[in-house]
Curated annotation (Swiss-Prot):
Enzyme class: transferase
Record pathway: Cofactor biosynthesis; coenzyme A biosynthesis; CoA from (R)-pantothenate: step 1/5
Chain segments annotated as transmembrane: none
Positions bound to K(+): 131
Binding positions for substrate per the UniProt entry: 109-112, 186
GO biological process: coenzyme A biosynthetic process
Cofactor note: A monovalent cation. Ammonium or potassium.
Binding site for ATP: 6-13, 134
Disulphide bridges, residue numbers: none
Any one GO MF annotation of this record: ATP binding
Protein name per UniProt: Type III pantothenate kinase
Subcellular localization(s) per the UniProt record: Cytoplasm
Required co-factors: NH4(+); K(+)
Length: 271
């Protein structure tokens, strides 16, 4: 079994895969809050508790982290508790198979690279990936699987929390779809601005990408939503085609398998 670990600023998502290649299947996933202060021992204790009887069935680990302190602890955890298990940490220098056609490839987040890989693998077409997480990322992937760049905006929670904390008369509200775009009270007005406002933000960015890049003006372009808040925002958008909740975990699986295949090729007596 392959354990995939997706660490973001807000949540950590674990995914457990059986099989490989076309026969791979995500059989279980878990979600927990990210704590940048967690140690390797604490991470191991939580992971083992969630995995239960599957702990001893892990044959590989593929992980990414947008939180540097957690990435360091995951590296220690893997060495200390799963030292016998092959693992891949997606960071600069790791081969993903995704050409990064940007000014500084080292600046591109591992999550954006992995999402791009999975999107190209699933659809084999020009893709625009919208990840609704702590930040809202709109990433552009060519028909060849190249990462062309994108846009980063604040996430839904960050924007909503900032509005409440910086405004004396406003308070934090539950982020749900209001009954109308025209709010009848302060709570509904804030919910409308958050939900419909972010849907409009995404639609606006996607349309601009399609206008600016000739290769993205056709009907073959696939716009994919993923991330924690995708189920809330996607139904209100006009440009998003597909929802892939496990896109990042799928990308982590692909990175692991590609690196394992490369290692196997290097060990081949035919080389």
């Amino acid at each position: 079994m392959l354990l995939t670990v997706d660490v973001r600023n807000t949540n950590i998502v674990l995914g457990l895969f059986t099989g490989t290649g076309e026969h791979s299947k995500l059989v279980q996933d878990w979600r927990m809050r990210t704590d940048a202060r967690m140690t390797a021992d604490e991470l191991a204790l939580i992971f083992r508790g969630l995995l239960g009887a599957h702990t001893d069935q892990i044959t590989g680990v593929s992980a990414l982290s947008t939180v540097p302190s957690v990435l360091r602890e995951i590296r220690v955890m893997l060495t200390r508790y799963w030292g016998h298990v092959p693992h891949v940490l997606v960071e600069p220098g790791v081969r993903t198979g995704v050409p990064l056609l940007v000014d500084n490839p080292k600046e591109v987040g591992a999550d954006r690279i992995v999402n791009s890989l999975a999107a190209h693998h699933l659809y084999d077409a020009p893709c625009i990936v919208v990840d609704f997480g702590t930040s809202t990322c709109v990433d552009v992937v060519s028909a060849k699987g190249e990462f062309l760049g994108g846009a980063i905006a604040p996430g839904l929670e960050i924007s909503s929390d900032a509005l409440a904390s910086q405004s004396a008369a406003l308070r934090k509200v539950e982020l749900v779809r209001p009954r109308s775009v025209v709010g009848k009270n302060t709570v509904e007005c804030m919910q409308s601005g958050a939900v419909f406002g972010f849907a409009g933000l995404v639609d606006g960015l996607v349309r601009r990408v399609r206008r600016e890049l000739p290769a993205f003006s056709g009907s073959d372009v696939v716009v994919i939503a993923t991330g924690d808040r995708a189920p809330l925002i996607m139904p209100e958008t006009e440009t998003v085609d597909e929802h892939e909740p496990d896109l990042t975990l799928e990308g982590l699986r692909l990175v692991y398998e590609r690196n394992q295949a490369r290692r196997g090729a290097r060990r081949s007596p035919l080389d």
